[in-house]
């Protein structure tokens, strides 16, 4: 029915991709976000998957800076920074009367807020 070789090659490419490499060497929160990304891709939630892909790429970018992301606190730092940036974008979109883009940013913030601890979710 399925070409077994093609499936093995596909799975090995997934393991070697930058999103899923070194799963044991990453913080727990980052692993949870990657799991959520996989789930959203499987259930075809394009908006959620897109938001999480962008966030994971920002973590990768932060890893290449002077402050690499090595703990959950570092992931939270990047997450809070990302949410703050999106809030500023919402303000700019509302000033420009682009309510459609503001709503899109708000939904992306809601996607990211689910990874904040309860006491920090009011950010």
UniProtKB/Swiss-Prot annotation:
Gene Ontology biological process terms in this record: mitochondrial tRNA modification
GO cellular component: mitochondrial matrix
Cited SUPFAM superfamilies: GatB/YqeY motif (SSF89095)
Tree of life domain: Eukaryota
InterPro entries linked to this entry: Asn/Gln_tRNA_amidoTrase-B-like, YqeY/Aim41, YqeY/Aim41_N
Gene3D superfamilies reported for this sequence: Uncharacterised protein YqeY/AIM41 PF09424, N-terminal domain
GO molecular function ontology, one term from the record: carbon-nitrogen ligase activity, with glutamine as amido-N-donor
Name used for this protein in its record: Uncharacterized protein C22F3.15
